Amino acid sequence: MKRSVLVIALSSLLLSPLAMAKDLQVVASFSVVGDMVKQIGGDHVQVTDLVPPNGDPHEFEPTPKDSKTLAQADLVVVNGLGLEGWLNRLVKASGYKGSVLTASNGIKSLKMEEDGKTVTDPHAWNSMKNGIVYARNIVDALAKADPDHAADYRKQGDSYIQQLQQLDDYAVKAFAAIPKEKRKVLTSHDAFGYFAAAYGVHFLSPIGYSTEAEASSQTVAKLIKQIKQEHVKTYFIENQTDPRLVKQIADASGAQSGGELYPEALTDSNGPAATYTAAFKHNVDAIAGSMQ
């Protein structure tokens, strides 16, 4: 009799809503938005990044495994602004019918002329004020997808947004202390437009918004001349791009290495930029430090 009561009690526990609850399965297009979801979602979410750490979201090629991962998601979070050109065909191939959050919704985008076309700069997260917009969008999407834990998402989101605001203030103060004529650096590609607009830094690069673009010999020669004329003394490589071209330009112009930046891909957990906030602070410290 006692054994029967015990079996019934265990069965009731296993069938209870608490025991049956599962984490929200979220697929993120790349590591930056994936980390934001992890920070806000906490223990209630399982996040899979399609583009792995140190991976280039511009050149990513989805696999059948990615299609299967997407098909099992409860929510998909992407950057938008044209970053994930491969997304639509992946969604179609996977048969995913759920919600897709574009984390950049509400951002005032930047544009430039590239190869005779007007293109949108997708790297909005490199301004921390934009990062706050991303975070708010993610909070709302998680709360809608998993209303049972909405209060937790909003509490964790508020705390996270405070961190982002503090980092924005940190960056503003760091660059305000540097004379404007010194705020110039060379990078691999034009991923810092929003950062430049927010913090008053001038970035030079051989290629535009996408790492898939190629620089012509005329562009390279013109850039080398500009670097010399403007006395740009430091160049940076990026963890997700081929460094050879920017090193070639630096050698020809006399610019010295300032190290590595993380504008659109986080590192693995052992690296210096394993989270969005760590990557941003690293970039601020490295860039500002090179101008001293």
Regions picked out by a protein language model, each given a short descriptive name:
Residues 22-292:
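Extracytoplasmic metal-acquisition and chelation regions
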